[in-house]
From Swiss-Prot:
GO terms for molecular function: manganese ion binding; UDP-2,3-diacylglucosamine hydrolase activity. Mn(2+) 2 binds at D42, N80, H115, H196. It is found in: Cell inner membrane. Mn(2+) 1 binds at D9, H11, D42, H198. Hydrolyzes the pyrophosphate bond of UDP-2,3-diacylglucosamine to yield 2,3-diacylglucosamine 1-phosphate (lipid X) and UMP by catalyzing the attack of water at the alpha-P atom. Involved in the biosynthesis of lipid A, a phosphorylated glycolipid that anchors the lipopolysaccharide to the outer membrane of the cell. Its main location: membrane. Pfam families: Metallophos. One of its GO terms (cellular component) is cytoplasm. It comes from Actinobacillus succinogenes (strain ATCC 55618 / DSM 22257 / CCUG 43843 / 130Z). This is UDP-2,3-diacylglucosamine hydrolase. Its EC number is 3.6.1.54.
Length: 235
C-alpha cells in the first residue's frame, strides 16, 4: 500500500537516548515501506555545523543513508533548531534539502509543507531573532568559529529561548490564523502540513482548508501517515 510519512520536532540529542531509539525504530520498521519520508525540521535539538561529529550524528546519518539505499527518498526542511544543517551533511547520507516552503503532490492533492515557525507571526521577538540568524554573513561567520565556541553559543541561545517561552502566552506561540490563510492562498493549496508548535492535530478550516500539525517526540513518536485514502497519526 502506498504511504508517505511526515515527522518533525524530534529534538535528538546525546542527553535523550530514548528519542534516538524511537527514531531508529521508525527508520528500520516503518520507513522502509514508505514512498517517501519528510522530516519537517528540528530533527536535532540544535545544530552548530556540518563539521561536528558525534555517535548520535553518525547514527542518524547511517539510518538515513540505509533508507535511501533501500529506495526510499528522505526529504528535509530546516527547523528553528537545525537551520544550519547543510549540503555536507545531506551529501553524506543522501538527504534531500528543501526550501522553507515546498508544495508536493501528495497522491493527487497539492500539499504545502514547512517547519511552521514562519507562521507564528504574533511572536515578534522570535521573528526578529529568526531574521537575524538567517543573515548569510552571520551564518558564514558563525561556521568559522571553533566548535567549542559554537557549542557554547548554541547552549546559551537554547537556555534563553526556554526561559523566554515561560513568559509568552500560548496564543503568541501558535500560528497566526490570518497569515496562515494568506499562505494557503499564496501557494494555491487546500492542505498544509507543518510542525514547530508541538500541537498535534488536524484542523478543518472553512471553507475548504486543512491544516495538519505534527507533534513533538517524547515518550512516544509522533508520525503522520498519509495514504491515497486516509490521513492518520501513528505512535
Amino acid at each position: 500500500m502506498h504511504k508517505t510519512y511526515f515527522i518533525a520536532d524530534l529534538h535528538l540529542s546525546e542527553t535523550r537516548p530514548n528519542l534516538t531509539a524511537l527514531f531508529v525504530d521508525f527508520m528500520q520498521h516503518l520507513a522502509p515501506d514508505a514512498d517517501a519520508v519528510y522530516i519537517l525540521g528540528d530533527l536535532f535539538d540544535f545544530w552548530i555545523g556540518d563539521d561536528e561529529r558525534s555517535p548520535l550524528i553518525d547514527t542518524v546519518k547511517n539510518q538515513i543513508r540505509t533508507l535511501v539505499q533501500q529506495g526510499v527518498p528522505c526529504y528535509f526542511i530546516h527547523g528553528n533548531r537545525d537551520f544550519l544543517l547543510g549540503k555536507r551533511f545531506a551529501g553524506d547520507c543522501g538527504l534531500r534539502l528543501l526550501p522553507e516552503y515546498q508544495v508536493i503532490d501528495l497522491y493527487g492533492e497539492p500539499t504545502l509543507i514547512c517547519h511552521g515557525d514562519t507562521l507564528c507571526t504574533d511572536d515578534l521577538h522570535y521573528q526578529a531573532f529568526r531574521r537575524k540568524v538567517h543573515r548569510p554573513w552571520l551564518q558564514w561567520l558563525f561556521r568559522r568559529l571553533p566548535l567549542k565556541v559554537r557549542l557554547k553559543i548554541a547552549q546559551n541561545i537554547r537556555t534563553k529561548s526556554s526561559r523566554d517561552k515561560q513568559n509568552k502566552s500560548q496564543a503568541i506561540m501558535d500560528v497566526n490564523p490570518e497569515f496562515t490563510r494568506r499562505i494557503f492562498e499564496r501557494f494555491q493549496v487546500k492542505r498544509l502540513i507543518h510542525g514547530h508548535t508541538h500541537r498535534q492535530n488536524i484542523h478543518q478550516i472553512p471553507p475548504h482548508f486543512e491544516r495538519i500539525v505534527l507533534g513533538d517526540w517524547g515518550e512516544t513518536a509522533s508520525i503522520l501517515e498519509v495514504t491515497p485514502q486516509d490521513i492518520r497519526f501513528r505512535q
